[in-house]
Design a protein with these regions (language model features):
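A residue-level structural signature of the nucleotidyltransferase/glycosyltransferase Rossmann-like core
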Residues: 6, 44-45, 131-132
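Acidic, metal-coordinating catalytic segment for phosphate/diphosphate chemistry
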Residues: 1-35, 41
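A glycine-rich, hydrophobic loop/mini-helix early in the fold
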Residues: 35-65
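The catalytic Nudix box helix
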Residues: 46-47, 64-96
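Residues that flank catalytic or metal-binding motifs in active/ligand-binding sites
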Residues: 4, 32-34, 65, 109, ...
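Short, well-ordered strand-loop elements centered on a beta-strand within folded domains, enriched
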Residues: 15-18, 43-49, 120-124
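Nudix hydrolase/Nudix homology domain
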Residues: 19-22, 59, 71, 97-100, ...
């Protein structure tokens, strides 16, 4: 069995250790992740429904693609890797903002990117059960209503992105 190692970081996002992913989550240690917002030419956002095989937030709607920054990797190398692994595409990624770790964010520093792509996509079945395009106004409404079908991380990212 392959053990996934992640970098543990301090409050300034400096690497201080490396630990197995399971330990990082169990001990609530700070670590790094990326989230990518994929928009089409109609300004709709691609959402992914997380696989029921996932250990966290299974079956909930989330950003277009996301993942942990592996030990030895940077945000800049992780984002295109995750986009390709989860959706089977490449695109020019634009960095938007970085969120600081909180309990609601799983103690992750999250670098958020955006890109434009109209598909087609090849969703990774181990990661994603479904993908769909959604109008930004519909997302605004669902996020404002605290829709339980969306991950808390996605709602936090969306509010920041939209200035809500």
């Amino acid at each position: 069995m392959h053990i996934e190692f992640l970098a543990v970081v301090d409050e300034h996002d400096r690497i201080i250790d490396r630990r197995p992913r399971s330990e990082i989550h169990a001990l609530k240690l700070r670590h790094r992740a990326v989230h990518i917002l994929v928009f089409n030419d109609q300004q709709q956002l691609l959402l992914q429904k997380r696989s029921m095989k996932k250990d966290l937030n299974k079956g909930l709607w989330d950003t277009s693609a996301a993942g942990h920054v592996d030990d030895g990797e940077t945000y800049e190398t992780c984002a295109p890797r995750e986009l390709h692994e989860e959706l089977g595409v490449t695109a020019d990624l634009i960095p938007l903002f970085k969120l600081k770790p909180t309990v609601d964010l799983g103690m992750e520093f999250i670098q958020v990117y955006r890109c434009r792509h109209n598909g087609p996509f090849t969703a990774c079945s181990d990661e994603i059960d479904e993908i769909r395009w959604m109008d930004m106004s519909e997302i605004d409404m669902q996020v404002n209503q605290q829709d339980a079908s969306m991950t808390e991380t996605f709602k936090i990212i969306w509010r920041r992105y939209r200035g809500l």
